[in-house]
Amino acid sequence: MVKKNLSTSAILFKDLLRTLKKDWKQFISIILISLLSTCLFAGLISNANKLEKRANNLYSSCNYADIYVTTNSYDKKDIINLPSQIEEIETIEKRTYMPVDFKKNGINIIVSDSENTLSHPILISGEYGYLAMGKFLQSENLKIGDSFSITCNNFLKNSLLEYSRILDNLKTNDTNILLESKINFSIKITGEMYHPEGVQNSSFSSSLGYMSPEYLKELILNLIKNNYNYDSLDGLISLFMGSSLEDLISSKLDSFSNQYLIKAKNSLSNDNTLEQIRQYYESKKENNLMLATEKEYLESYQMLNQDVTQAGKLPYVFPIIFFLVSALIILTTITQIIIKQRSQIGCLKAIGVPRKNIYIHYMGIGTFLTLFGSLLGMILGPIIIPPVLEVKYNLLWDLPKTTTPFFSWQALLMLISMLLITIICGFFVSRNVIKEKPVKTLRPKISVAQKHVPNPNSFYYKHTSLSLKMALRNISKSKAKTIMVILGTLGCSSLAVCGFGIMDTLNYGIFYDYNANINMKISAEGLENNKNIKEDIYTIEGVEKVEIVSSYSATLISETSYIISPVYLLENNSSYFPAINEHPGLNIDKTTADKLNLKVGDEIDISINSNSYTKKINRIFESSILHGIYDLSVNYSENISSVSVYYIYGKKDISNDNLKENLLQSNLFSSINTYDDMMTRAHEIMSSIELMTDVIKIFAILLCIVVIYNLSSLNISERTRDIATMKVLGFKFKSIASTLTIELMVDAVIGGLLGLLFGFPMTYMVLSVNITSLLTFMYHIYWYSYMYGFLVTGGTALVVSLFLNKKIKKVKMVESLKSIE
């Protein structure tokens, strides 16, 4: 009997060293599969926590307002009456929200006092004056100190026209800006900022600008100085008003305020506060309320919060597959190791080692390996995964940087789950052996006789090779291992199809929009000094038709919410958007309609600059990247400014590239793009998402390699006596290897084919938690992607199997055929 614990520990430690030396490859497979599953899960959790941290840091640093109240006219009593009548209002501040025209998407400029504390900007560099978002500077290739031009409604027109003698002070040959419907400002960028309302990338939506009233006043004064005799005009204003022109403009700017920001004492009671605000405005003689909403209904907040939520869901999609496969691999590996050590367990029991120590020993082997692999995965995951996905987030969002959080309770829970599975597997597998008597475990386990003996005269028996017969026999004999291989390759195949399917879905959406929804050959934007060049375009060689499509950044308002979205106005008999000819009236994409909770027949309010329209929805269409409203231009006012794009269609005998060359030589355009150019640009935007799909494919291949390597190694170890027998009987290496390869490939083919069935559901799950405001997913997987997914799985399995078949040469015939009896 072993009396001292030290002696028992020494025996078990030596046994552990022997086991490590003999089965080190199986142990590495446990470490790798634990590492892969934990690495992917911990990395995605870290990515989700990092994105949420970036958003929350921005919100707290900017002191994000709880409620936004937008009015159509300024009433100075509101800012006094609202907090006095509504107890829940802690802080209220006023500002001016001013959409302006700039290129295609426009800019939403906030004019706010520097003393305001709600939803204020974070200054990155430069100084206060006009602050721009970093993504805007990057996309427009601008820097601090540069200037750019904007166009906006002439808010001075109605406020200063009462001073008719101003016209007498107009400079010779200059423009009387007070009579113009639009005015232009040249804005100098003084600083770069972060702001919670401007987090969306300006390449895909309106950017945000932030300026002080003093800066806007300076812009107006410069505009007046450029067009009027300033000194005489200032004297005239002083004579009639008793104040300087500068003071007059300051008072006028104050009356332009159209928005109140509110911080509630208790954000949980925002619904009640909103109701009281609406009741206050309804009780007024002149109700000037346009919209009162919580910050949660702002488009910028909704879109970012959607991405944060989706990032939090992503770790629970395909990493679960790795977790389940990991559990199966660990179970199989530990089972095989313990079964191979039946005789050693019998010896340990025979010399008096307590059962408790044997349990701890075999449970501890798997636990230690799983713990090591999982800890390594918890470290590597946050290092590898977040930087890859950050490429996507930086494309979409303008957020402050932050450090990557490493350890999280979710990853720790994953680690504990892995350890529990390993401990439970080790206990129950070792229990089946430990409960046997020592004398029984010292003998080889008796194989169960084959119940069904094939008929040697049957067609199957005569026309089937020996390798295939043995492979099929081994498959039916080792059902547990067969299930492991099938499940492992099923996971690999479904992940591979998912990786290809994501890109198929994106490409299909783009192809659908540019071929089914719109008809585009060449698009061109005219130079700023060439507003009406349609007739000139017709004189260019090869041009058959020219269509002008005007785009606007508009506010779309339904009964429940509002968003900023583009509006595209088309000519009659449109070639660019052919559906408008069959469905004349307002056409809106499904994503925009869903945001506003609208259906066909509902009415929508459209605010473009200072013009308001109420339209009935005639058609809702499926789209991927086309978002907004499409309508005929004849249904709208002619005096609203727009950004116009010329869609040019060539004659049949000229290619798009040749027509583009002719258009470039005309010097009428600032930019020209063909259909191929747009496709190239779209794929460049998708490159960040393609990087994510490559990660999925790589993990799928790694999963397949680990599973096949582990189970193939176990298979060869189990078949040692069979391999030695075949060698004795004179079978060559090729014949023996083909038996093992066929056995593995039959399982891999079954698993690969089953995995194809799960490819589409997995693609749907992954993309459903990655919805963005840029595009709507039109789920689609091409047939050849299924083929590629199957080939990736089958090819990986075949390569690993052929590599491991070299072990057959190391099997020694005499030693392998020895029996303990």
Put a short name on every predicted segment:
Residues 327, 331-336, 341-343, 367-399, ...:
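Small-residue-rich transmembrane alpha-helices
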Residues 354-355, 437, 599, 732, ...:
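Short coil/turn motifs that cap or connect alpha-helices
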Residues 2, 435-452, 806-821:
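Short cytosolic juxtamembrane segments of multi-pass membrane proteins
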Residues 1-39, 363, 367, 451-491, ...:
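N-terminal Sec/SRP start-transfer signal
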Residues 69, 466-594, 599-602, 606-612, ...:
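Juxtamembrane segments of multi-pass membrane proteins
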Residues 2-327, 336, 395, 509-522, ...:
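Membrane transport/envelope proteins' first extracytoplasmic loop
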Residues 645-647, 662-768, 772, 776-781, ...:
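C-terminal transmembrane helical bundles of large multi-pass transporters
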Residues 23, 328-368, 704-747:
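Interfacial "coupling" helices/loops that link adjacent transmembrane helices in transporter permeases
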